[in-house]
């Protein structure tokens, strides 16, 4: 191998021939996708394109009508629940924290369900995960209702990281957040990816997130998927993709991308 040639990333997750339909409505028609080890992959598409359904399919939370998903070369449905929980972390759109549990108790929940760690060890790890997500350890005693929207997202990140997953699935991580808070979440995602090597799959309609932190983007349109770098997708002639990436809202995201890459 030439010393200047970068080693090719291998897929950590592969989906082949995915078909999802609800009743007579087909959402995905034989979609195939590789998620590469260590990348941040963004998934975008219009309303009704099945972004969240695809995310759940890739994470093993939804069984497709046809096709298969493999994680580390193993069919995802053959991986035991505990092993899958240790490999995959999921952040749902609204955080999905239990309101009756404190923040720390929410973070410890996966440890209680899937490990035999002592309570003291769970508490110590929960404090570490909260810090990793950009929260102080004393936030752990609070309840979700006492947190801002951005802090709820960070607490959900901490819980998703509880079992040291190799791949994170994030459903609209910056939705309902002001631009400054959303920027902080983007920075957190990039830091987790760069410092821990975690592979990240993000469903988002946030163009700034897509343009600034995603190595590749997968766009759902007409029941199919188109995958590539932003530069490659910008050259697409598919009508929805072209309108999405060249519309008025894309201009600000492109400016943010130039600034981000200039600072990076």
Task: List each language-model region with its residue ranges.
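The feature captures the beta-strand-to-loop junction immediately N-terminal to the Walker
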Residues: 44-46
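Helix-to-loop junction immediately C-terminal to a conserved catalytic motif
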Residues: 59
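Conserved ABC ATPase "signature" region
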Residues: 120-138
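Conserved ABC ATPase signature
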Residues: 143-147, 151
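Conserved catalytic motifs of ABC-family nucleotide-binding domains
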Residues: 164
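Catalytic Walker B motif of ABC-type/P-loop ATPase nucleotide-binding domains
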Residues: 168-171
